């Protein structure tokens, strides 16, 4: 992100695109903290990275950063047909524009937004100890506040964040794990 801003004409806004020779470089449109991307022919990639004084990302570090920002880096297919885009933080990730276009689920998404009915949201979770299992419930003081949807190295859960029993600083329990959000 910082390196991108050193280029001529670069702007500090997600998705902003500049051109290097004929190839685009752009800040990740979901979150500028994910850095910039260069779309280029593989044959020119390493020479261009060297000339621009850039480096490719370490995949594990990138996945960890994505997870910490609430962006699902892996196992996205586990969310299919389980959530609305607005529950997956698509609005915050610049994936929903309420001013234009038609898309699948538009009516439900607009209704949720308009009536302020968004009560659950996808959150990254961290395992303190134990083991997670996809589909299991998450509890705070015996009250269910969510469900584990992704149980991999970068786990996510659908959390009822407006529930009075949800405190983002608290530790929560599943059947076999202690977690935090």
PLM features: what roles do these ranges have?
Residues 11-13, 18-24, 94-106, 152:
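Hydrophobic transmembrane alpha-helix bundles
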Residues 36, 64, 75, 81, ...:
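Conserved active-site beta-strand-loop modules that form the wall/rim of enzyme catalytic pockets
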């Amino acid at each position: 992100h910082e390196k991108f801003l050193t280029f001529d004409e670069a702007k500090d806004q997600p998705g902003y695109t500049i051109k290097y020779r004929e190839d685009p470089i752009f800040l990740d449109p979901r979150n500028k903290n994910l850095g910039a991307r260069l779309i280029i022919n593989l044959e020119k990639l390493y020479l261009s990275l060297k000339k621009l004084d850039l480096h490719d990302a370490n995949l594990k570090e990138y996945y960890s950063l994505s997870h910490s920002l609430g962006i699902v880096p892996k196992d996205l297919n586990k969310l299919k047909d389980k959530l609305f885009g607005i529950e997956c933080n698509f609005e915050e990730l610049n994936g929903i524009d309420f001013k234009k276009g038609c898309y699948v689920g538009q009516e439900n998404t607009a209704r949720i937004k308009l009536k302020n009915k968004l009560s659950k949201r996808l959150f990254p979770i961290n395992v303190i100890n134990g083991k997670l299992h996809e589909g299991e419930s998450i509890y705070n003081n015996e009250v269910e506040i969510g469900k584990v949807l992704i149980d991999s190295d970068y786990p996510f859960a659908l959390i009822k964040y407006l529930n009075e029993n949800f405190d983002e600083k608290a530790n929560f329990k599943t059947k076999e794990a202690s977690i935090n959000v």
